Amino acid sequence: MDRSDMMHVMYDKKGPKVAENFAKRGFEAYYCPTKEEALQKALALIPADHVVSWGGSVSINEIGLRPYVLEHYQVIDRDAAASPEERVELMRKALLCDTFIMGTNAATEDGQLYNIDGNGNRVAALVYGPKQVVVIVGMNKVAPTLEDAVVRARTVAAPINKQRFAAPTPCIVTGMCADCNSEGSICNQFVRTRRCSPAGRIKIILVGENLGF
């Protein structure tokens, strides 16, 4: 058994239990061993007549969800904006869509989400607005404790994510979080989601593969 196989075995052992822990906190939660199964589960959760939007996420692209939604659903796509002003308006409209799809920076084994956001539109939609939120969570994002999840979000996810943006920050240069107060920081909103209310509004799809960063 090679390293990759061992990883999947461990994910398959842990994933269903983590899904159970999310369910105990009011989330609707599923474990899917593969990206392909995760895509089918996500599509089964999104009615054909829903207007769909999304937050910045590598994971929703890696399972093929965003490309499928773009082709088969009515969407609110900020990347289709013709100007910065229109982009902002589309991001605002996305807060009232039917289904919002996103990834997460970190999750915990006891069933919590932890996210860091720049503009705040992604975490705003998670907290309130869309009728439902579908969150794609690679098992590599699952940390043992909340403290570990915070460390993961700040020192792993955020510095890597920041490499996609031009505004200079210390982590672009060093690859490490400096807890900066830079104008170009994407670490502006820190949101812990410890329960889902109303119950079932947030759907968690845990995936037995490494997704995103």
Model regions: which residues?
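Unusually extended, aromatic-enriched hydrophobic runs near protein termini
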Residues: 1, 11-18, 63, 70-73, ...
